[in-house]
Design a protein with these regions (language model features):
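Active-site neighborhoods of divalent-metal-dependent phosphate/nucleic-acid chemistry enzymes
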Residues: 75-119
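PIN-domain endoribonuclease scaffold, especially VapC-family toxins
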Residues: 28-31, 38-87
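Acidic, PIN/NYN-like endoribonuclease modules and their adjacent C-terminal/linker elements
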Residues: 108-113, 117-148
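Short amphipathic alpha-helical segments and helix-helix/interface helices
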Residues: 21-25, 63-66, 103-104, 122
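Residue-level signal for well-ordered alpha-helical positions
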Residues: 17, 47, 127-128
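Alpha-helix capping/helix-boundary segments
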Residues: 9-10, 40, 103, 120-121
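Short, well-structured N-terminal submotif of metal-dependent ribonuclease cores
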Residues: 1-36
Length: 148
């Protein structure tokens, strides 16, 4: 299964670097493949001062964690996504959160669901009739073996 990782998944990992989300992303023998638009890295960089302030991490520590969290993510350049998908994505999310268009555009291009904890995005897309998102609970059923 391939999923698109949303920025808020990475943000959450900074606040809980040993939590479930970080564990899923860092899993070495993962049955999941992660992809994301390169915009994710730009967004993290933009919010880095806020992350540093709230987590008390140093910039060096945060960069090391970011490397850990993104080591299993394949990044796609927005420039490589056809303009028609960019424009459609912008129309879809303009009333939800315009900053999320790169993730929706990648979904439109690749067809994989977006892994997000952003209820506003997930619910907003559902209200518009789009089934584009996957929950952490759904992700966990694909990555972790059942306990007997």
């Amino acid at each position: 299964m391939i999923v698109i990782s949303d920025s808020n998944i990475i943000f959450s990992c900074f606040y809980s670097p040993n939590g479930v989300l970080a564990s899923i992303l860092k899993e070495k023998k993962n049955r999941l493949q992660f992809i994301a638009p390169d915009f994710l890295l730009e967004e993290i960089e933009e919010h880095l001062p806020e992350i540093l302030k709230n987590t008390k991490l140093t910039k060096k520590q945060a960069k090391a964690l970011l490397k850990d969290f993104t080591q299993n993510i394949t990044f796609f350049k927005l420039d490589d996504i056809p303009q028609r998908n960019i424009e459609k994505a912008q129309r879809i999310v303009e009333s939800i959160d315009p900053d999320d268009y790169p993730f929706v555009a990648l979904h439109l291009e690749k067809g994989h669901k977006i892994w997000t904890c952003d209820a506003k995005l997930s619910n907003g897309l559902k209200e518009k009739g789009y089934d584009m998102c996957v929950t952490t609970k759904e992700i966990k059923t694909k990555t972790y073996k059942k306990s007997y």
